[in-house]
């Protein structure tokens, strides 16, 4: 695909430059920096290819899967528990789940493992922008039209306003350098999965505090 080729060109150019310089560099510290650049660029290319391949597989698989009535509450609880088991001890980041208890159930028409993937990718994104010992809030509620809403709210730096329309584009990534763990496909995959379920996804910055909010609205059953 042309967009994959375009995205690989940047790390390839950097890789080529670093490899050309390193053989003529005698300074140990400079060589270490160049090796670090080489490693980072190779990993970036590997992530791009792996994620793109997975996305293509997902697109084929999605066309074959059947949707069922499922309660979002139990799926979300399971994913939140899994993430807390990893990140509370690893980085002190806690995922808090807030459910509107006045609502008995949160039924949607969906594919269970794809719903898990939506939340997992959103949490991955929030965690990558969060500093250690912060809280990420996952909220489930319904709007006045009885549509189920899943929100992920973090305490990171938020999105740059002018880039809010771009964050769901394929390969877009505004991630800080120290969090270079993803290819920029995560939110694009989420958008595709949400739209497969007939839903809407929105992103915004928190008005009264730092951080960002991503909201997924599922259609009424």
Give a label for each model feature.
Residues 60-65, 105-110:
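Conserved micro-motifs of the catalytic ATP-binding
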Residues 66-81:
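A conserved beta-strand-to-alpha-helix junction within the catalytic ATP-binding
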Residues 159-171:
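Short conserved segment of the HATPase_c
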């Amino acid at each position: 695909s042309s967009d994959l080729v375009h995205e690989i060109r940047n790390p390839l150019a950097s890789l080529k430059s670093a490899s050309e310089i390193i053989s003529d560099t005698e300074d140990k510290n400079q060589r270490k920096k160049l090796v670090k650049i080489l490693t980072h660029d190779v990993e970036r290319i590997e992530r791009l290819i792996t994620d793109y391949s997975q996305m293509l597989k997902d697109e084929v698989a999605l066309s074959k899967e059947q949707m069922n009535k499922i309660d979002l509450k139990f799926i979300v609880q399971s994913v939140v528990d899994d993430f807390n088991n990893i990140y509370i001890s690893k980085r002190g980041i806690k995922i808090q789940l807030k459910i509107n208890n006045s609502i008995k159930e949160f039924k949607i028409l969906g594919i269970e493992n794809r719903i898990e993937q939506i939340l997992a990718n959103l949490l991955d994104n929030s965690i990558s922008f969060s500093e250690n010992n912060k809280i990420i809030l996952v909220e489930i509620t319904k709007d006045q039209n009885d549509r189920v809403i899943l929100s992920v709210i973090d305490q990171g730096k938020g999105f740059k306003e002018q880039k809010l329309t771009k964050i769901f584009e394929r390969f877009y990534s505004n991630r800080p350098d120290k969090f270079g763990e993803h290819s920029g496909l995560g939110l694009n995959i989420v958008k595709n999965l949400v739209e497969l379920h007939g839903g809407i996804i929105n992103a915004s910055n928190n008005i009264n505090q730092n951080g960002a909010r991503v909201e997924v609205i599922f259609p009424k059953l």
